[in-house]
């Protein structure tokens, strides 16, 4: 979900809405919201200059992506967001399935090289 360059309250609201929608549609998925990860960072991080703060947020996001995620979901606008494009590259490099959501926060497609997991995800979202 693109976060930079928009009001933080808007991004937080979108993140909560997406988590709620995906959790309702896919109750066995554990949804990790990047804004929740950032919220858990030490208070000092929030006082850093913008570029260092962004680096800390992205570092925590990447740590969660590589350490906890079985797949990564992307909302509309992901391809114009530097952070989202970085996450897409990481998902490609580490063979994590990429789940793309449409404007209604519904899964529109699943891509990836881990075919067993992609097939499982496609079955779950009725994409086969």
Residue ranges and their predicted role:
Residues 1-128:
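Conserved catalytic or regulatory cores that recognize and/or transform ribose-phosphate-containing ligands
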